[in-house]
């Protein structure tokens, strides 16, 4: 989200570790599996194309130890004019509370929701492993709707969300 938000200055993003240790793809002698960090990069690569819109977020905040108040909701919106698609990337960082989110997208009033992808697990230390490679994976299961350009969505606590819109 941060790299997209600063796309006017950040022209390329690289992953330092592509395989093993802290990588989005882990391997062993017998197989390979995707870590949870793989999916946000996959979504950004697939759906984060176009113009990053100036996304104004009003959210409850928490106190970060060395950085003062930080919003629970982190969000960026990308408009792909060529494909007539809009994608919302959002993270609810609240560890306990789900968040009802309202977005004013009246400039896209003739768009409909294509899908709401969510990735969530109650256990923050849960991970995908060789034995359980799909423990945490994105699912098209989010709860969102759009009416006259006003989008409402329920974002689970500790969740990554991708809401895709397309012109009717």
Regions found by a protein language model. Name each.
Residues 15-16, 28, 89-91, 119:
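Generic beta-strand/beta-sheet core signal
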Residues 1-74, 81-84:
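Aromatic/acidic polysaccharide-binding cleft in carbohydrate-active enzymes
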Residues 147-168:
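Beta-strand-rich recognition/accessory modules
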Residues 109-151:
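Acidic, Ser/Thr/Pro-rich beta/coil linker or hinge segments at domain junctions
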């Amino acid at each position: 989200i941060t790299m997209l938000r600063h796309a006017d200055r950040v022209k390329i993003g690289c992953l330092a570790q592509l395989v093993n240790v802290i990588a989005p793809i882990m391997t062993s002698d017998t197989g390979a599996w995707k870590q949870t960090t793989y999916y946000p990069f996959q979504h950004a690569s697939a759906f984060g194309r176009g113009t990053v819109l100036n996304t104004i977020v009003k959210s409850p905040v928490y106190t970060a130890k060395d950085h003062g108040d930080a919003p629970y909701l982190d969000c960026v919106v990308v408009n792909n004019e060529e494909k007539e698609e809009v994608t919302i990337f959002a993270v609810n960082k609240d560890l306990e509370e789900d968040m009802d989110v309202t977005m004013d997208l009246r400039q896209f009033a003739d768009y409909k929701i294509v899908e709401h992808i969510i990735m969530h697990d109650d256990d923050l230390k849960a991970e995908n492993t060789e034995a359980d490679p799909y423990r945490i994976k994105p699912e098209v299961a989010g709860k969102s709707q759009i009416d006259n350009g006003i989008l409402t969505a329920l974002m689970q606590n500790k969740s990554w969300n991708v809401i895709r819109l397309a012109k009717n």
